[in-house]
Each structure stands twice: as C-alpha cells, then as structure tokens.
Amino acid sequence: KTAPIKMFCPLHGPVWRTNLGYYLDKHDKWSRYIPEENGVMIVYASMYGNTESAAQALAAQLCEKGVTNVRVYDVSKTHVSYLVAEAFKYSHIVLASVTYNLNIYPVMEDFLHHLKVLNLSKRVFGIIENGSWAIKSGSLMEQYIDENLKDCKILNARMTINSSANRSNASELDALSDAIVKSVAIEEKAFEQRVIDDAAFAEEEARKAAFKKLSAKERMALMREKHRQEKGE
C-alpha cells in the first residue's frame, strides 16, 4: 500500500517538498542500479597523453557512428564523486588505463574501488589498456569487475596499446566502437520497455489514488460497472 507523499527527506542531501515525482524516480533507479541514460562514459588514466588520445579517438568514432550521448573524463583531474555520479547515470562505461608497476594506474584503481563500495551493477564495460614491456591493466580491470561488480558485462573487443596508438590499433578501435554501438542499440530497446512499464505503473497508481477518493457509493457503482463489462453485458 502507498500513502500520499508530501515531503521527501533523503538521509544525505536536501529535503524535497516540490516536484517529488522527479526525485523519487531518480532514487528508485539508483536503488535498483538502473542507468538513468543510455549512453557512454569514457574514463581514462593517462601518464603521457597516449591513453587520453585513444579515449578521445573512441569518443569521436562513437559520435560518427551515431552514439552521441558520450562523456569523456580524466580520472586524474575529475574528483571521484563526479565520476561516481556519472557512472550511476550512464549504461556503458569504458575504462582506459595505462599499466603502472604491473598494476592498474592508482587513480583508476581508486575509481573502481568507489564503484565497488557503492555496489554499482548492471553496466556494460569496455576496456582500453596501455603499457610498454608488460601490459597488465586491461586484464586486471576485467578481473576487478568480475570479482566485485554484480550483473555487469565486459565487451570482448578490448583495445591494447603498446605505449602509443599506431595504425595497427585502428582495427581494434573500430571493433571496440562497433561493439559499443551494438550494445547501446540493444540497451535502447530495454530503455524503451522500461519507459512503457513506468508509464503503465504510474497510470495504475493514479487510478488507485483516484479510486480511494471516491465515496463508498461511487466505488460500488464503479465495481458493478466493471463487473458488467467483464461479463460482456
């Protein structure tokens, strides 16, 4: 059963007294880890600019192929609180990281840690890795996702860069962007269905609320009419 809501008081954040439907919808999605938007968040950790160049090239190629809801962030310059908010917003996340001492670059690892402690789930991940003599960041990021983030999918089209991207990486970049475009198209259908389901739920809730406002006599008359319609009278 539901009761009329006049005020929404989250544990962390302001108290909302107006436009409650908007904020309740946001919290409903966040609590179920459902993305707010079907789009791509590209997060990169770059030491000398080469991983950044690959991330920007991917963003440009996605836009050329029709996926324009794309955001690109430097994990070294953007505070993790903003990155987490965007991770909850978008359906697809691309992690682009250089290898650092046979590990994930520290600021990227910190970002992943925050996703873990906040239980982010139900996302599609793409991977770009970079390194020189021992490229490990990609496999380590995949392992971290598999072990710590629930109900997430990792695209098979990983891009591997040896220090800086060259012509041989063009096919990998193309394959990764194609995989993301295909996945976004699939997710779009799921988004459309959720919109339909949410609208149906809202309509049913409105109908229930209107029914509760009726007098006992009006309710009985409405129920009798519904019964007659069901019998085909």
Regions found by a protein language model. Give the residues of each.
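Flexible, glycine-rich phosphate/dinucleotide-binding loops
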Residues: 17, 49, 79, 134
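Divalent-metal (often Zn2+) His-rich catalytic cores of metallo-beta-lactamase-fold enzymes
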Residues: 1-36
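A short acidic (Asp/Glu
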Residues: 20-21, 53, 138
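Short, charged N-terminal beta->alpha structural module
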Residues: 43-65
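Short gly/ser/thr-rich secondary-structure transition/capping motifs
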Residues: 25, 72-78
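FMN-binding flavodoxin-like domain, especially the glycine-rich phosphate-binding loop
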Residues: 1-8, 13-15, 57-73, 83-233
